[in-house]
């Protein structure tokens, strides 16, 4: 038995703290009061309401060359925010009829999922000058999809678009209609697109420079009923990596990086960089190690964060976290982490953890790797958290755990001299706004203009920055 498997086996029998069950596989819960880090925060920026409701903030990107931060509202608007957060301007409205873009934003999970700014966005004469990319849901299913649903049913499409600004320094988008790069036919209404991102820590001499990573959910429903995440001929349940400026992809609208793991494999899509994910909402790179952390939302049992590498299989739907997936109600407690071909989580927790009792739960979100020094208690920490209830967690980036909740520690916010959860902070803000206190957070993380960690949510329109 490997060291990791032996450790898990000992944990399953040794701890009296927490009863183990097929729907609660860990014997040790998250320690609610141990190794807690409390940090200060500021209300860095406020997005305008949309139709009388708070903006559904999804993602924030800080290009080096333009001196501001771009923030996405899931309803289809991208805002330009000054570095100090005081000036918020509408940069691009995808709903503007000039663009003829269909946005399906009904329900909690549909809308514009993410966006990315090309690393050459602010470099005149460069191929990526002025280019940004959006990844969103559309109710226009008439065009033929580049990536079929894997079955007969199609609920909507998720579409990757390229926009080209004439002047990246402008406070409002001044380019023309977008160019469509790829279209996915979604078999179900949930688990749509995840994050779009370029690796921000590579230089133009690195083969990863300018390569666009695309998080794609498993198609939805529950339990991945068509086993799309493990099917290398289907686009769902994957992380793609493409060259958005290339033309050698199957539809001629993007390129295939030569170092992608399945290039030349007739039984796999060449766009695939990693697979076996359920709903990869967010990922982030470590500036020091280059590791790419992916937070992947579990079914009904385990939430996880993993390090994804070239060609990695993150396990779904054969595995949910460190355990064999049986059904939406159970995992197999025997032989955890026993398949050497699978990349298992570095940290995970159970949806049934006592920490979440009485609260909306659960869906892994984040992440951010803090290598700064302005907030010493966060230095060298990987931050992630839970989307619905807004719990923020940390583990040590220099001493990575090997699964389980033992290294999942809490981050609380200093709110008027008291250590509070993000949900509690938002509820106080809701009362101040004259709104009913929110029951959930819908948390995401972003990066500020100087590498600060931003906390986004869908409940009060406030973007918070962690500060010294």
Q: How should these model regions be labeled?
A:
Residues 1-3:
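N-terminal secretory signal peptides that target proteins for export/translocation
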Residues 312, 323, 328-331, 342, ...:
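Long, low-charge, small-residue-enriched segments that form tightly packed helices used
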Residues 266-306:
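Repeat-solenoid scaffold signature
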Residues 6-16:
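Bacterial N-terminal signal peptides
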Residues 221-234:
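Acidic/polar, solvent-exposed loop segments in beta-strand-rich repeat domains
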Residues 20-223, 282-285, 290-298, 360-399, ...:
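Acidic, Gly/Ser/Thr-rich repeat motifs that build Ca2+-stabilized beta-propeller blades
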Residues 246-248, 308-340:
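Mobile, glycine-enriched helix-loop/loop "lid" segments at the mouths of ligand-binding/catalytic clefts
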Residues 27-52, 85-106, 162-187, 208, ...:
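Blade-edge beta-strand/turn elements of extracellular beta-propeller
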């Amino acid at each position: 038995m490997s060291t990791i498997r032996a450790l898990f086996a000992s944990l399953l029998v040794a701890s009296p703290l927490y009863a183990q069950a097929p729907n609660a596989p860990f014997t040790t819960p998250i320690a609610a009061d141990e190794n807690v880090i409390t940090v200060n925060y500021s209300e860095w920026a406020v997005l305008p309401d949309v139709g009388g409701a708070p903006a559904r903030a999804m993602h924030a990107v800080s290009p080096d060359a333009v001196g501001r931060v771009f923030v996405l509202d899931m309803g289809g608007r991208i805002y330009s925010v000054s570095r100090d957060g005081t000036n918020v301007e509408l940069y691009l409205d995808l709903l503007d009829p000039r663009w003829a873009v269909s946005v399906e934003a009904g329900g909690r999970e549909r809308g514009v999922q993410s966006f990315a700014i090309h690393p050459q966005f602010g470099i005149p004469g460069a191929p990526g000058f002025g280019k940004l990319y959006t990844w969103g849901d559309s109710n226009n299913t008439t065009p033929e999809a580049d990536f079929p649903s894997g079955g007969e049913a199609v609920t909507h499409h998720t579409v990757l678009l390229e926009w080209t600004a004439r002047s990246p320094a402008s406070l409002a988008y001044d380019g023309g209609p977008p160019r469509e790069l790829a279209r996915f036919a979604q078999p179900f209404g949930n688990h749509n697109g995840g994050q779009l991102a370029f690796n921000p820590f590579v230089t133009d001499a690195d083969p990863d420079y300018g390569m666009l990573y695309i998080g794609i959910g498993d198609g939805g429903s529950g339990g991945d009923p068509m086993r799309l995440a493990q099917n290398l001929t289907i686009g769902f349940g994957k992380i793609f990596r493409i060259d958005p400026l290339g033309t050698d992809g199957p539809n001629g609208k993007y390129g295939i990086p030569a170092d992608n793991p399945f290039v030349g494999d007739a039984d796999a899509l060449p766009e695939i960089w990693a697979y076996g994910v359920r709903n990869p909402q967010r990922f982030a790179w470590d500036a020091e190690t280059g590791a790419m952390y992916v937070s992947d939302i579990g079914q009904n049992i385990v939430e996880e964060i993993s390090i994804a590498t070239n060609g990695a299989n993150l396990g779904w739907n054969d595995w949910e976290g460190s355990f064999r997936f049986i059904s939406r109600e159970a995992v197999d407690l025997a032989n955890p982490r026993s398949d050497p071909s699978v990349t298992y989580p570095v940290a995970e927790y159970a949806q049934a953890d006592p920490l979440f009792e009485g609260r909306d739960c659960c869906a892994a979100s984040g992440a951010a790797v803090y290598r700064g020094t302005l907030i010493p208690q966060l230095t060298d920490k990987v931050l992630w958290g839970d989307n619905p209830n807004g719990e923020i967690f940390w583990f040590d980036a220099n001493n990575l755990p090997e699964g389980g909740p033992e290294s999942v520690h809490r981050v609380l916010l200093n709110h008027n001299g008291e250590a509070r959860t993000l949900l509690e902070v938002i509820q106080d803000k809701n009362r101040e706004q004259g709104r009913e206190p929110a029951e959930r957070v819908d948390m995401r993380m972003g990066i500020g203009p100087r590498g600060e960690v931003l906390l986004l949510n869908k409940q009060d329109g406030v973007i918070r920055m962690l500060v010294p």
